[in-house]
UniProtKB/Swiss-Prot annotation:
Name of one Pfam family that matches: Ammonium_transp
Coiled-coil ranges (or none): none
Lipid bilayer topology: Multi-pass membrane protein
GO molecular-function term, one example from the UniProt record: ammonium channel activity
Protein name: Putative ammonium transporter sll0108
InterPro entries membership: Ammonium/urea_transptr, Ammonium_transpt, Ammonium_transpt_CS, NH4_transpt_AmtB-like_dom
Gene3D superfamilies to which the protein is assigned, alphabetical: Ammonium transporter AmtB like domains (1.10.3430.10)
Region listing for Disordered, in residue ranges: 1-23
Annotated transmembrane regions: 44-64, 90-110, 128-148, 154-174, 178-198, 211-231, 245-265, 286-306, 315-335, 347-367, 370-390, 399-419, 438-458
């Protein structure tokens, strides 16, 4: 019995009293667990708002810091964009300057092709050396007379030998970041163009030394003074509102007036006028002439768009108006010479293209596409009749430089008063701009013509400007340079020394 009782006690058969006590104990343990858990969790629950506050403060600080960083970044980006734009401007103007400088090769090819082979070396030498002379003369005094900020409305002064900065030359209107050196190079290319124009009109009879002297004075004094009137912000024509975007007058008419004075005082070539009537003296290489024209056409895409002085979208518009005018000039000159003389003359086609380019140069940035076609088309017609006119009055111009650059430089400058989309007469701008254009043409023409005539006359009286008749007959290649452009060829000439054919030397 005792074992049975023990087994019951040890095996676990509990009485109802024991089961009740056990249930109460478990409930108490559960309640205690929940109590303890609540006590333990309460501090962590209190940390939730604090944590949220810390996170909010952290985010606010981060946002403020990010805003500051964004502001700094925007300022840095703007500075970098401005610097990049300035660099692009400088690169574009440098490329444009190189294109304009290469136009000297075009002038050399054009003039050589339209003249006789016995004068080819002389013409090539003049076109090459004139750029070197122009660079030195314009560097020494020309750039300062044109843009020096210490001058007055009639002439600039200060910063000779390119010794100043933007403040010395008054370049503040020009785009930010454009170096003075780049602007100088672009302008010196323009100045050389004015002197090169003269070379063609006085070709085949001008003394080499005297031509160089005149070129230095033109580029160093006359061209910068009139250029100051128009392109410097303090110039009197600039203040008046005269418009010549890329130089129909400042470059081309100036060169044309100087050429006219020189051709007049030189007189015609031997054999040009027989019994008072003009005779043809054909050029020796039309291939050279055509190639020269094409080089000039390409170079004009630096000449006109480069005058924007910035690498922006306006350059493309200017390039299109320039190309349209050149094309229209070439076409109208072709058909005009065809109708006038019965056949299309290649020399007139060439001069028509160049006339269109000269004509659009003043207004290329401010006329419509249709306006550029009309301006170029009229220029092509003018050049054909202008060449005939100067022949009639016995002004001998071997390459038609006066007709291309002077006549159409004047026309292109006048055309601004008609076709400019803001101030032109045909666009409701009234006659005021046209009057201003006429004043500028007359003022620059009078100054340049008088200056050139006086200088040529002094040179003629003191040193002589024309080679001897014998030297002209032999050719300036031998007389002035002691060499020939084409060795190994026999040159057949007419009674006036004009080469009419060539043949290889027989063995």
């Amino acid at each position: 019995m005792s074992n049975s009782i023990l087994s019951k006690l040890n095996v676990g058969e509990r009485s109802p009293v024991n089961r009740t006590h056990s249930s109460r104990t478990e409930a108490e343990k559960s309640s205690l667990f929940r109590f303890v858990r609540r006590k333990i969790n309460s501090p962590w629950l209190a940390c939730v708002p604090l944590t949220a506050l810390i996170v909010a403060i952290w985010n606010a600080a981060a946002i403020a810091q990010d805003t500051e960083i964004v502001n700094i970044t925007v300022e840095t980006v703007n500075e970098n964009v401005a610097t990049l734009q300035g660099t692009l401007n400088a690169i574009w103007i440098l490329i444009a300057a190189i294109l304009v400088i290469f136009m000297n090769a075009g002038f050399g090819m054009l003039e050589t092709g339209l003249c006789r082979q016995k004068n080819a070396v002389n013409i090539l030498t003049k076109n090459l050396i004139v750029f070197a002379l122009a660079t030195i003369a314009y560097w020494a005094i020309g750039f300062s007379l044109m843009f020096g900020s210490s001058g007055n409305p009639f002439v600039g002064f200060g910063g000779f030998f390119l010794s100043g900065d933007h403040t010395n030359y008054g370049l503040s209107p020009f785009p930010e970041g454009l170096p003075v050196a780049v602007f100088f190079l672009f302008q010196v290319a323009f100045s050389a163009t004015a002197a090169t124009i003269v070379s063609g009109a006085v070709a085949e009879r001008i003394k080499f030394n005297e031509f160089l002297i005149f070129s230095v004075l033109l580029v160093g004094i006359a061209y910068p003074i009139t250029g100051h009137w128009v392109w410097d912000a303090g110039g009197w024509l600039y203040t008046m509102g005269f418009m010549d975007f890329a130089g129909s007058t400042v470059v081309h008419s100036v060169g044309g007036w100087a050429a006219l004075a020189g051709a007049f005082l030189l007189g015609p070539r031997l054999g040009k006028f027989v019994d008072g009537r003009p005779g043809a003296i054909p050029g020796h290489n039309m291939g050279f002439a055509m190639l020269g024209c094409l080089i000039l056409w390409i170079g004009w895409f630096g000449f006109n768009p480069g005058s924007q002085l910035a690498a922006d979208q306006a350059c493309a518009y200017i390039a299109v108006t320039t190309n349209l005018a050149a094309s229209a000039g070439g076409l109208t000159a072709t058909f005009t010479s065809w109708l006038k003389d019965g056949k299309p003359d290649l020399t007139m086609v060439i001069n028509g293209v160049l006339a269109g380019l000269v004509g659009i140069t003043a207004g290329c940035a401010g006329v419509s596409y249709w306006g550029s076609v009309i301006i170029g088309g009229i220029a092509g017609i003018l050049v054909v009749y202008s060449v005939a006119f100067f022949d009639k009055i016995k002004i001998d111009d071997p390459v038609g430089a006066i007709s291309v650059h002077l006549v159409n430089g004047v026309w292109g400058t006048l055309a601004v008063g008609f076709f400019n989309m803001e101030k032109g007469l045909f666009y409701g701008g009234g006659i005021n701009q046209l009057i201003i254009q006429i004043v500028g043409i007359l003022a620059i023409g009078a100054f340049t013509a008088i200056f050139s005539f006086v200088v040529w006359a002094i040179l003629k009286q003191t040193m002589g400007i024309r080679v001897s008749g014998e030297e002209e007959m032999i050719g300036l290649d031998i007389g002035e340079h002691g060499m020939e452009a084409y060795t190994g060829f026999v040159k057949e000439t007419d009674s006036f020394g004009s080469a009419v054919s060539g043949a290889t030397v027989p063995e």
